[in-house]
Structures are given as C-alpha cells and as structure tokens.
C-alpha cells in the first residue's frame, strides 16, 4: 500500500510539473514594441479583409521593411524618385507587391502613426478588392520607426495567371 501511495504521489507531481511547463511560454506571441504592435494590428486587419489566416511571412516582412527604409526619409516623407508601391516579378506568374500605407485622403503621402495613436487603436478596418482576395498567396506586414512615428507597409505575393 505504501508503494502505491508513493507511486501515485510521484505521478501526480509529474503531471503538475508538466501542466506548469505547458502553461508557461510557448503560447501566442504578444507584441512588445510599438513597431511589433503596429505589425500585429495591420496583420489582423488584412487577414480579416482577405478572409485568411496568414502568418507574417519572414521574407516578405523583411522586404516590406527594406522598402520602407529605402523609400522614406527620416521624417517619414518619400525620398525623391520613390513611390508608395513597389512590385517585382518573383517568377512563375508570382509577383511580390509592397504597398506603403497612405494617409487617408492622400494616397501619395505615407501614413505615420504615433505611439499614442497606436495605444488607442485596437482595430483597423481595411478594404481589399476582389482581385486582391483572389490572387493573394502570401502576406506580411513590416513597420519601421522614423522620428516619433511608425510607418507600415503591406507585402503580398500574388499569383497572376492568364487563362
């Protein structure tokens, strides 16, 4: 009987330790910096608009951040000769398109969000046309901080096949 009690106690201790380990860490990612919060906010918004559940693709995120760094001055304005949209042929009818988010009412001016504005936003609504919904095969959001504002770019892979 003593051996049985001891065995049950050891098993119970093992189960409790396992439960504690699975409850700690390894859970969902919680953004900590304002840049990460902006990326998570817009990733959720675009997944909702597209009706998808894409993860933030690391290669596309890197491309989005590179486009932001290459296109924006330190004050968040566009550099001479740069535009709000970057696209490249990735081969096999697949294109990579990066769009810098624009200010409402002016598609040629990058939208910079402050930390205070970001803290007050829990949801963003974006509109996506049907063609984008039908052709998007990958998604990522990249953000960079310039001055006191965060600028966001959306990177997508699109499969454009002619029938």
Question: What positions do the PLM features span?
Answer:
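Residue-level signal for functionally critical sites in structured catalytic/ligand-binding pockets
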Residues: 1-2, 50, 61, 125, ...
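Bacterial Sec-dependent N-terminal signal peptides
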Residues: 1-11
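C-terminal motif of bacterial Sec signal peptides marking the signal peptidase cleavage site
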Residues: 19-23
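Short, conserved catalytic or interaction motifs in soluble domains
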Residues: 26
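Short, well-ordered surface patches within globular domains
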Residues: 29-94, 135-137
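A well-ordered secondary-structure block
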Residues: 88-163
């Amino acid at each position: 009987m003593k051996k049985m009690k001891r065995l049950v106690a050891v098993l119970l201790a093992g189960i409790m330790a396992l439960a504690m380990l699975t409850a700690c860490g390894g859970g969902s990612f919680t953004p900590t910096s304002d840049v990460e919060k902006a990326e998570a906010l817009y990733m959720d918004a675009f997944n909702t608009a597209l009706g998808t559940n894409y993860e933030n693709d690391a290669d596309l995120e890197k491309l989005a951040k590179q486009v932001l760094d290459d296109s924006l001055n330190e004050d968040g304005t566009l550099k001479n000769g740069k535009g709000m949209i970057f696209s490249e042929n990735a081969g096999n009818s697949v294109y990579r398109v990066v769009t810098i988010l624009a200010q409402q009412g002016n598609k040629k001016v990058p939208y910079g969000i402050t930390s205070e504005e970001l803290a007050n936003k829990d949801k963003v609504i974006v509109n996506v046309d049907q063609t984008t919904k039908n052709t998007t095969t990958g998604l990522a959001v990249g953000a960079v901080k310039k001055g006191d504002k965060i600028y966001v770019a959306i990177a997508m892979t699109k499969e454009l096949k002619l029938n």
